[in-house]
Regions:
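Residues forming the flavin
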Residues: 1-306
Length: 306
């Protein structure tokens, strides 16, 4: 038996959380991304993980104003590149804050937030009232694994994969399914080689939390053409290096959490194709081109349309 039932969203208890206009992130993203429905005009987000950060950016693309985002921890738990996209769009991000209540008569009309101390308790006198018509709750996921646990207690030969086994990014869930599928096939008698140790290492890399943030560095020259990387946090990501037709962008394939760098020794081979700019999911690559003017560069920036 393979259990790959995914995860469910965690709920959050606060006054007014049953008012119309309080959404889980999954329902909100389904409406916006799949059904192309604009469910609100003025959104406030609770939770600074990747789900909340990405949902906020999707809302902006759908023409929805994001009035703010609240995160109880001192820093957002999601990738910095996703947080930066919201910050560049002018979204206020309130770290070390929590939601106290949603206000409204027949629907959400505003939200009350407050700063928290180190024990995550609200600090009196720090309350803020923010107008909004919708609250998006994105405070984490938990595995849908009840059936898995029951199967184990009665002695069934059972496996789990993806978020039903461990909450992680989608890429990690897909890779864990590949590993477990291989294990099951061997158990059923298929003549397959042992799972390479590199697969297990890759799975751990894909499941890893955001790493350290390093100071942003720049190429100090006024000639030629070259990319500038604005990703300064170690996360498992390598699209920019994989699409470069000249192999001028390098990320250590043994551990794709390492930051990318441009091979300046071969900089004259760059053809300014812009693929690295277009492919970056964090919009964290720009292209600087001094070939026409030595003192004024043509800069290509990533923009995602509504």
């Amino acid at each position: 038996l393979l259990v790959a039932t995914g995860a469910r969203e965690r709920s959050l208890s606060f006054s007014g959380n049953t008012l119309p206009g309080v959404y889980g992130a999954g329902a909100f993203q389904t409406l916006v991304n799949r059904d192309l429905v604009k469910p609100c005009e003025n959104l406030f987000i609770i939770g600074g993980g990747n789900v909340g950060l990405i949902a906020g950016y999707h809302a902006i693309q759908a023409g929805i104003n994001v009035a703010g985002l609240v995160e109880a921890a001192p820093e957002c738990g999601g990738y910095k590149v996703h947080k930066d996209k919201l910050a560049r769009s002018g979204v206020p991000i309130y770290t070390s804050h929590t939601v106290l209540e949603a206000r409204g008569t027949d629907k959400v009309e505003s939200v009350v937030i407050a700063q928290v101390d180190r024990q995550f308790k609200p600090i009196p006198g720090t309350e803020k009232v923010i107008d909004c018509d919708t609250l998006l709750i994105a405070v984490g996921l938990e595995p849908v694994n009840e059936f898995l646990q029951i199967a184990r207690t009665i002695g069934m030969d059972v496996y789990s994969a993806g978020d039903a086994n461990e909450i992680a990014e989608a890429s990690a869930a897909i890779f864990s399914g590949k590993i477990v599928g291989n294990e099951i096939a061997k158990k059923l008698g298929k003549d397959l080689p042992d799972i390479p140790a590199s697969w297990m290492e890759t799975e751990e890399i894909l499941k890893s939390k955001p790493g350290m943030i390093v100071p942003e560095t720049y190429i100090d020259k006024l000639e030629g053409v070259f990319p500038v990387f604005h990703c300064v946090q170690e996360i498992p990501c390598n699209p920019c290096s994989s699409v470069c037709p000249k192999d001028l962008i390098y990320i250590d394939e043994a551990d794709i959490r390492h930051l990318p760098y441009f091979n300046e020794e071969r900089a004259d081979e760059c053809i300014a194709c812009g693929r690295c700019v277009a492919v970056c999911p964090g919009l964290a690559v720009s292209l600087v081109d001094f070939r026409k003017r030595s003192q004024t560069a043509l800069v290509s920036l990533p923009v995602e349309q509504n």
